[in-house]
Design a protein with these regions (language model features):
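Terminal targeting signals and extreme-terminal segments of soluble enzymes
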Residues: 1-167
Length: 167
């Protein structure tokens, strides 16, 4: 897996589009996280790689954008918030959609997390994401979160509703 420092940040990718889209503006200017996709991002369009599309797999590095000096419970809360920013991407990828698909709407139906170790949101974490299923307007995203040293710190699952206007 490429080191996060070698990858382009979501902030850099979205900066040119910040004036055209509220979504792009959020990632370029307001996201509290430094997000770097190993698997090509679907922020700007659907995935053209059929292998990634078919599997729904995705790898993403993430950490706080800046230094956070708060109690452990807040580091965990920030990890939960951060995962929510990328959790549905594998579901959309598998469905052949992207975050920028015109008229798309999606919402979390259920979200669960399991903690195995303390989290330092100031350090890079690798989100190893997958989607076992995406069909009939619903999808299930699952992820394991690892430290840069390969320790599992958390696992999560999120079910979502996805709607795309009929063409």
């Amino acid at each position: 897996v490429p080191a996060p420092e070698t990858l382009t940040s979501a902030k850099e990718l979205m900066e040119p589009y910040a004036d055209k889209s509220p979504f792009a503006k959020f990632y370029a200017k307001k996201s509290p996280f430094d997000i770097r996709h190993v698997t090509p991002t679907i922020m700007l369009g659907a995935d053209k790689d059929s292998a990634a599309h078919d599997s729904g797999k995705q790898l993403v590095w993430m950490k706080a954008d800046g230094v956070v000096d708060v109690p452990q419970v807040m580091h965990r809360a920030m990890l939960a918030l951060g995962c929510d920013q990328v959790m549905m991407e594998p579901v959309l990828r598998r469905a052949g959609l992207s975050i920028s698909t015109p008229g798309i709407s999606y919402a979390s139906i259920d979200h669960s997390m399991w903690w195995y170790r303390d989290v330092d949101i100031n350090q890079w974490h690798l989100y190893v994401q997958d989607t076992p299923t995406a069909a009939h307007g619903r999808g299930l995203g699952v992820a394991k979160v690892y430290t840069q040293d390969g320790e599992l710190v958390a696992a999560m699952a999120q079910e979502a509703m996805i709607r795309v206007p009929q063409q």
